[in-house]
Amino acid sequence: MLRIADKTFNSHLFTGTGKFASSQLMVEAIRASGSQLVTLAMKRVDLRQHNDAILMPLIEAGVTLLPNTSGAKTAEEAIFAAQLAREALGTHWLKLEIHPDARWLLPDPIETLKAAEALVKQGFVVLPYCGADPVLCKRLEEVGCAAVMPLGAPIGSNQGLETKAMLEIIIQQSTVPVVVDAGIGVPSHATQALEMGADAVLVNTAIAVADDPVMMATAFRLAVEAGVLARQAVPGNRSPYASATSPLTGFLEALA
């Protein structure tokens, strides 16, 4: 079980809604993933349409919606988008995203911290997408963010946990849930993140662009479950030396 703010989730896999070939395929993949928290960009939703092709299938699927501020380049833009999302969707949950550079999509740490502090004061449950910076993640925690979402690698890059060393520090020092977001390309990346101690992962591109998104979503569900179980089982310590699993002496004498 994973608890963030006022909600509890059975699944440790969060999913996104971008890049799917159709809304039907998106919903099928989300269902196969077992995900209970789904993020969607407000810029992709037509709030004037009551039967929006992205929003309505998600509502019917019964998942918790996590609107995000993707596209915002400043704290002010993100705060405005958050207020629109709360009014339109009736949720105070928000994935805060501020990335001014369209090529790299790296989060702006200064604007993110500024917006997070303001939004928490306005009553939002803020989950900020941020760089894998232990100092920044601690500051975001201190201003009241309900979780932190450090990147594993640039958005959509499928590179995996390129920031592993920093993620380990963030996980070790955090007192709020840590959700590894961005860069996860294959199910084994997700397993590794959960084994490290991350509370959840958010996966979008790796599922959406697969030849079979539903099958890939299933693979990610199983990978996340494996990672959680492995962590709970408490793996043995790593050692630079060999450790025999069978006796090395005495067996010949026993056979004599």
From Swiss-Prot:
It comes from the Bacteria. Its EC number is 2.8.1.10. The active site is at 95 (schiff-base intermediate with dxp). The keyword Ligase does not apply. 1-deoxy-D-xylulose 5-phosphate binds at residues 156, 182-183, 204-205. Signal peptide: none annotated. GO terms for cellular component: cytoplasm. Gene3D superfamilies: Aldolase class I. CDD domains: ThiG (cd04728). It holds the Pfam family ThiG. Pathway: Cofactor biosynthesis; thiamine diphosphate biosynthesis. Keywords: Cytoplasm, Schiff base, Thiamine biosynthesis, Transferase. One of its GO terms (biological process) is thiamine diphosphate biosynthetic process. InterPro entries: Aldolase_TIM, Thiazole_synthase_ThiG, ThiG. GO terms for molecular function: thiazole synthase activity. It catalyses: [ThiS sulfur-carrier protein]-C-terminal-Gly-aminoethanethioate + 2-iminoacetate + 1-deoxy-D-xylulose 5-phosphate = [ThiS sulfur-carrier protein]-C-terminal Gly-Gly + 2-[(2R,5Z)-2-carboxy-4-methylthiazol-5(2H)-ylidene]ethyl phosphate + 2 H2O + H(+). It is found in: Cytoplasm. Catalyzes the rearrangement of 1-deoxy-D-xylulose 5-phosphate (DXP) to produce the thiazole phosphate moiety of thiamine. Sulfur is provided by the thiocarboxylate moiety of the carrier protein ThiS. In vitro, sulfur can be provided by H(2)S. HAMAP family: ThiG. Belongs to the ThiG family. Homotetramer. Forms heterodimers with either ThiH or ThiS. This is Thiazole synthase. It comes from Salmonella schwarzengrund (strain CVM19633). The lineage of its organism: Bacteria, Pseudomonadati, Pseudomonadota, Gammaproteobacteria, Enterobacterales.
